[in-house]
Amino acid sequence: MEADLLFLRKLMDCKVITALDGTILRELLNPLHDGSRFHLGYSIAHAIIPVGKTSLPHRLIKASEVYYILEGRGLMHVDAETKEVGPGSLIYIPPMTTQFLENTGTTNIVFLCIVDPYWRPDDEELVEVDE
């Protein structure tokens, strides 16, 4: 019997975790956990940064990331650059760059995070940033 080709996962069926950087996360799809049925080089997660909070400065060593902001407003910090972001903003974050997202708005920042190659715990590290 052939395996189902259509894969469907609902956000609310995904476990809520707190990521290393403090972001509230639901991993939607990651070949590391979801097995070899997916021919993907990336992972995708749904993330939230609550009002008044900031993710901890961190970097991915080998992977790049793309954030797509669904809701909320804030400041995206990548190395020495800072830009305002809001719904519809897409941010590319190269490997080995220090990054964090600061919620400056009145609602949660909700975004999708795509990591390529797919996210692995040994590829992420916290970084101390001088104020």
Q: How would you describe each model-predicted region?
A:
Residues M1-G41, L126-E131:
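A short, N-terminal "cap"/entry segment at the start of jelly-roll beta-barrel domains
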Residues L29-H33, A45-L60:
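Conserved short histidine dyad/triad with adjacent acidic residue
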Residues S36-H39, S55-L60, E102-T104:
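Short histidine-centered beta-strand/loop micro-motifs
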Residues T54-L56, L75, I91, P95-L101:
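Histidine-centered metal-chelating micro-motifs
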Residues K62-S64, I69-G74:
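Glycine- and acidic-residue-biased ligand/ion/polar-headgroup-sensing regions
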Residues R73-L75, T82, T98, N108:
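Structural motif
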